[in-house]
Structures are given as structure tokens and as C-alpha cells.
Amino acid sequence: MLNMPSKLHVIGTPVSSDKIVTSSSTHPELNIQPQEMPILMTFANSPYLFMGKFTVEKNVTLYFAPKSELNQNKINWKPLTTASDEIQNIIAYGNDLYLLSSKGNPHFNILKTNLQKPDLKNAEIVFKGTSEWKVSKIFLAKDFIIINKSKNELIIKQSFYNLKTGKVSSPEIKLE
């Protein structure tokens, strides 16, 4: 489907009362193409709202705004990433943003930047994929990022990044 808007639906209300949050007509400055789907993302522990322009391309263009702007007539989206940043996933925690990126590392890095002054060029690398273990997915679980690493896309291991301490642990799970 082309030219899809992103809407806010309140459970228990009719779909006809859904509010259009972002679309090519409400936000022409975002240059949302007909084939791009504007998808909203929120994280419980972050005061920010994110909007990604998604297509079949893995790398996503992202924008962000304070969650409080959801109550306004129009959200003032600020640019965050472009497809050339090679970002495939994000996790927000407080004012920090963690990004899964293949830029500069075909085995992926997890980057960290502060959303009060985001700076991807100088983002901290908190976890590096290696030629043996590629970072394949990241998930948020309370105060941790679960990092799925794959070896030849056949063997999967997990590491855990503690969002409070910044420490990575990789427990060995023995299968008998």
C-alpha cells in the first residue's frame, strides 16, 4: 500500500477517531515517499518518540521528538539518521539511544549517543561484532539490551549489555 499515514489509536475508541501523527501531507518537510511507511516507536523508559521511514531497504531514516508532542496538532520531528548511517535498529533508554549499525563494520556495532545532543559521528561503540560473531539482533529487556550474535548464521549466542552499568556479560549456557 502506498502513501500510508502513521496514526495514533486509543484502545476502546472507534478507528474513525484515530489521529494522523505523521504522513506525507501532514509533514511535507520530511519528504516521505509513497513507498515509505512512517512507523512510530516508543520505549517505556525514554521520554522520546521515534519515527522511521521504512521500506524494503534494511537501513532506516529516523526522526525523534519528545513524547509530549503527541498531544500537539503537529509533531516537530528532528532528524536523527539517514540511510547512509546504516542503522537497522534502535533502543532508547532515558536520554540515551543505542543503535545497531553496519557502518564501518560489516559485522555490526552497537553505538550509544545522548538524545539531548545526538552525535552519530562521535557515538560511543559499546559492543563490536567480530568476524567470528556478527551482531544479528538487539532487544530491550527491562534494564538490559539482549544482543544476539551469530556464527555463520547457524549458531546463536547471547550477550547482555547492562543499561545501568554499561557492562557486558556473556554467560555460558550449557546444553546437556
Segments the model singles out, each with a brief description of its role:
Residues M1-E176:
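Peripheral, non-catalytic segments that deliver or gate enzyme domains
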